[in-house]
């Protein structure tokens, strides 16, 4: 029975590695849940702590984080753009390095995806070999049972819940990114991995993200290292876009192992 189960998981892992097939599955599920079942849910404004979240200015309009994140359902007829939004490729740089770390147990480890918007990121994680029962995600919006509705500033997960946490392009939408880092540290297990990505944008060209006047935004991985300084066992990867070229908009990525 175990052999059949392993063969089953192996076959589906291989199928999910095929970008076109994986993305097609994600899109079909999205159209079914979002348009047919109309299953979209938002973390309610009464629950959302607006002081934690920034305001976004886009196309001469103001958005909160929830309404801004819903832009992934816009302009779906643009096939190239839609494919990119649903194939999870933006997260590849955060999770593919896991394959170079030999202590990860893909059969047993529990992994959390923070702020995936759609299921593309989750199916990409599954393609690495993680079991569905061990994959969770959390977002302010959800259209399927694969994503828990909630706010990463303050989650309902128990202490030491996850072996790996992937947090891509979330921290810079917060006025209190250190609060999120504290929560990530709480819910990750001892010796667990935290993989973080965010976009560095020089202040003089960052016209979309509007922070509270007293906020010091995240713009360098050095701020993450400082916050975690007493809880870092090893830093496996650290690309700081600001340090590399402070005049250019780019992605910063850091992957580290924590100790508690």
Cite the ranges covered by each PLM segment.
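A short acidic, Gly/Pro-enriched loop at the edge of an enzyme's catalytic core
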Residues: 150-165
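Core SAM-dependent methyltransferase catalytic element
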Residues: 230-260
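Conserved beta-strand signature within the Rossmann-like core of class I S-adenosyl-L-methionine
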Residues: 191-200
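Class I SAM-dependent methyltransferase SAM/SAH-binding core
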Residues: 109-154
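Class I SAM-dependent methyltransferase Rossmann-like catalytic core
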Residues: 34-105
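Helix-to-beta-strand junctions that scaffold the AdoMet/dcAdoMet cofactor pocket
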Residues: 174-175, 188-190
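Conserved Class I S-adenosyl-L-methionine
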Residues: 206-237
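A short SAM/SAH-binding and catalytic strip from SAM-dependent methyltransferases
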Residues: 164-177
């Amino acid at each position: 029975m175990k052999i059949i189960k392993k063969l089953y998981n192996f076959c589906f892992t291989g199928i999910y590695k095929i970008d076109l097939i994986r993305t097609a599955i994600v899109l079909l599920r999205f159209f079914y849940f979002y348009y047919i079942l109309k299953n979209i849910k938002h973390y309610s404004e009464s629950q959302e702590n607006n002081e934690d979240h920034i305001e976004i200015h886009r196309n001469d309009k103001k958005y909160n984080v929830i309404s801004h994140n819903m832009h992934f359902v816009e302009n779906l007829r643009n096939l190239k753009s839609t494919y990119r939004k649903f194939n999870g490729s933006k997260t590849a740089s955060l999770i593919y390095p896991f394959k170079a770390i030999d202590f990860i147990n893909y059969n047993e480890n529990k992994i959390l995806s923070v702020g995936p918007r759609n299921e593309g990121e989750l199916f990409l994680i599954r393609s690495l070999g993680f079991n569905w029962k061990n994959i969770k995600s959390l977002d302010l919006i959800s259209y399927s049972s694969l994503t828990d509705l909630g706010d990463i500033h303050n989650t309902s997960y128990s202490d030491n819940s996850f072996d790996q946490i992937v947090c891509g392009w979330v921290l810079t939408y917060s006025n209190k990114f250190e609060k999120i880092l504290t929560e990530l540290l709480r819910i990750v297990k001892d010796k667990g991995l935290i993989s973080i990505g965010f976009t560095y944008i020089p202040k003089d060209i960052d016209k979309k993200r509007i922070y509270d006047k007293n906020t010091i935004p995240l713009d360098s991985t050095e701020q993450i290292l400082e916050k975690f300084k007493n809880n870092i066992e090893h830093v496996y990867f650290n690309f700081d876009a600001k340090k590399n070229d402070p005049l250019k908009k780019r992605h910063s990525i850091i992957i580290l192992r924590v100790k508690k």
